[in-house]
């Protein structure tokens, strides 16, 4: 098998595992706060909102930093850092005894997140130009499959073996993804020389559809708010 194809197929497994691990938390997080002593539905929703929002807020803030590191050091190291970091965070979640501890761990999880975005750039750079669309399409399907199956199986796992044991199991799964990435994913990375930072005006000149991209980002932001706002409250409802 060609090296780039092996990288694509292994990436599909890793992306599915990490997407599953991230999304499975949605239906059980409010119930976990209840186990930690949060009793009223309003308080459960509040703590769940804090824990959920904390992760994605930090992701938004640190994503440019990790992107810069990936440009300097390569994408594979980002995959390894993210998968093992999220694995450790899930393991730590299983041993929390206070709501504040859960929120802190979720903040840390936001710091180490970024597996899927790094995989996109890795596959785009490693795949032949004529097969890039095919590879990225498969990657998006794996990410979507993990995101859809995660809440379904997450609730079942928590009901079967308990919430804390579910966190441990998911942590092991993410660690497995990191192990696969470490051993089997290959990257032909060549460090790029330092380039001049572009101002917004110069960036607009180089990107013909700059305004359309900005509009798309705003629309995606609004869409994410609409979707994610339901996660902390749907289980309580």
Labelled PLM ranges:
Residues 1-4, 186-218:
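Juxtamembrane intracellular "pre-TM" segments in multi-pass secondary transporters
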Residues 60-97:
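Conserved MFS/SLC helix-loop-helix module at the cytosolic interface between two early adjacent transmembrane helices
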């Amino acid at each position: 098998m060609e090296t780039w194809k092996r990288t694509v197929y292994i990436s599909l497994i890793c992306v599915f595992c990490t997407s599953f691990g991230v999304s499975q938390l949605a239906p059980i997080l409010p119930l976990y706060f209840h186990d930690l002593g949060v009793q009223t539905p309003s308080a459960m929703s509040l703590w769940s909102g804090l824990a959920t929002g904390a992760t994605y807020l930090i992701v938004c803030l640190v994503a440019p930093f990790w992107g810069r590191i990936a440009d300097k050091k390569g994408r594979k190291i980002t995959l390894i850092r993210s998968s093992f970091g999220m694995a450790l965070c899930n393991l730590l979640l299983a041993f929390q005894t206070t709501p504040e501890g859960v929120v802190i761990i979720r903040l840390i999880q936001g710091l180490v997140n970024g597996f899927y975005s790094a995989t996109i750039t890795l596959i785009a750079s490693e795949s032949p130009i004529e097969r890039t669309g095919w590879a990225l399409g498969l990657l998006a399907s794996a990410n979507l499959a993990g995101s859809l199956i995660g809440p379904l199986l997450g609730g079942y796992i928590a009901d079967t073996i308990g919430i804390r044991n579910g966190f441990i199991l998911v942590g092991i799964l993410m660690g497995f993804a990191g192990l696969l990435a470490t051993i089997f994913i290959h990257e032909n990375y060549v460090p790029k020389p330092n380039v001049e930072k572009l101002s917004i005006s110069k960036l607009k000149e180089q990107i013909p559809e700059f305004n359309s991209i900005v509009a798309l980002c705003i629309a995606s932001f609004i869409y994410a708010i609409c979707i994610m706002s339901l996660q902390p409250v749907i289980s309580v409802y």
